[in-house]
Regions:
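Active-site substrate-recognition segment that forms the wall
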Residues: 99, 108-115, 202-204, 219-301
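Flavin (FAD/FMN) cofactor-binding and adjacent substrate-gating region
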Residues: 1-5, 73-79, 103-117, 122-184
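N-terminal Rossmann-like FAD-binding beta1-loop-alpha1 element of flavoenzymes
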Residues: 22-49
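Helical element adjacent to the flavin cofactor pocket in flavoenzyme catalytic cores
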Residues: 137, 162-224
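Glycine-rich FAD pyrophosphate-binding loop
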Residues: 42-62
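Extreme N-terminal leader/targeting segments of oxidoreductases
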Residues: 1-24, 42
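A non-catalytic, amphipathic alpha-helix used as a structural packing/dimerization or gating element
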Residues: 85-103, 133
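Glycine-rich active-site loop/strand segments that organize a redox cofactor
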Residues: 62-92
């Protein structure tokens, strides 16, 4: 659905052929790679981005489109394990990552159906108590005042379901169309004179005393620095990272556009939702008012 939805926005880019030189070679054309390229280009550096498939092809273009701060462990767990100093640094980074999305959208005029607000829905009374404690903790420790506690009745009204015990509305969260955002970053990078190449598979990386040589199936880039932004698609390029990857699959379905009556009943304020199940469910409405629903996580080694 995402890919079919952006055919008019998609511009093809050339394969990397022959030899090139730059300051930074970025491998990977998703959110991380494109954002890295934009920041480097803003500093006046010559940048080349190499993507093995199409820009936004990987997880950046296939996710649920939801935007949240914090970390998967929970910032309170980080603080207990590593101390308040590191926890505060990680919290600031997570919040800056959310702010950066809005900054990019404003700066480059990216049209990606961005909406504000997300609900974390509690599937048990115990989880609701955790939400209450976590909200107070974030207000007191990190001065984060975007969290509104919702009782069961309010969650029922916001989600159109009686399944949940309550939840928290995070006004700093949100959702967007991920491939539209990725392609907006591509256009932003291009405006900053970043050289962009698709369908170019990196086969080998040679580190010399003065440079890095990035070899593809049809060409080579000689760069002062390399940024590996490959996510799980890093096989053969960095064994240290590759050995720390565990494949984790999640599944997403998309409905037909909902009727106006159903839209008013389900997510009337257009918030995104995720719940507290270990294999969580997450869902939102698209700009065309389709339900984008994900869950059923699978792991393999």
């Amino acid at each position: 659905y995402y890919a079919q939805n952006i055919e008019t926005l998609k511009k093809p880019y050339d394969q990397l052929i022959d030899n090139h030189e730059c300051d930074i070679c970025v491998v990977g054309g998703g959110f991380s790679g494109l954002s890295t390229a934009i920041e480097a280009a803003k500093k006046g550096l010559k940048v080349i981005v190499i993507e093995q498939n199409l820009f936004g092809w990987g997880a950046s273009g296939r996710n649920g489109g939801q935007i949240w701060n914090d970390v998967s462990w929970g910032i309170d767990v980080i603080e207990k394990k590593y101390g308040i100093k590191l926890a505060r640094q990680i919290w600031d980074i997570s919040q800056a990552s959310v702010d950066l999305i809005d900054d990019r959208i404003r700066e480059f005029g990216i049209e990606c159906d961005k909406k504000n607000g997300g609900i974390s829905a509690a599937t048990s009374a115990a989880k609701l108590r955790e939400y209450e404690e976590n909200r107070e903790y974030k207000i007191k420790t990190y001065n984060y005042n975007n969290l509104e506690l919702l009782d069961k009745n309010n969650v029922d009204k916001e989600i159109g379901s009686s399944l949940y015990y309550g939840g928290v509305l995070d006004k700093g969260a949100g959702h967007l169309h991920p491939i539209k955002y990725a392609l907006g970053l591509v256009k932003a990078a291009e405006k900053l004179n970043v050289k962009l190449y698709e369908r170019s598979v990196v086969t080998k990386i040679n580190q010399t005393s003065h440079a890095v040589e990035v070899l593809t199936d049809r060409g080579m880039v000689k760069a002062k620095k390399i940024a590996l932004c490959c996510n799980a698609y890093i096989k053969g390029l960095n064994l240290g990272i590759e050995n720390r990857i565990m494949p984790c699959a999640t599944y997403i379905v998309c409905t037909e556009p909902l009727s106006q009556n159903l839209q008013r009943e389900i997510l009337p304020n257009d918030y995104c939702v995720s719940d507290t199940n270990f294999d969580l469910n997450y869902y939102r409405l698209s700009d065309s008012k389709r339900m984008i629903f994900g869950g059923a996580v699978g792991y393999s080694l």
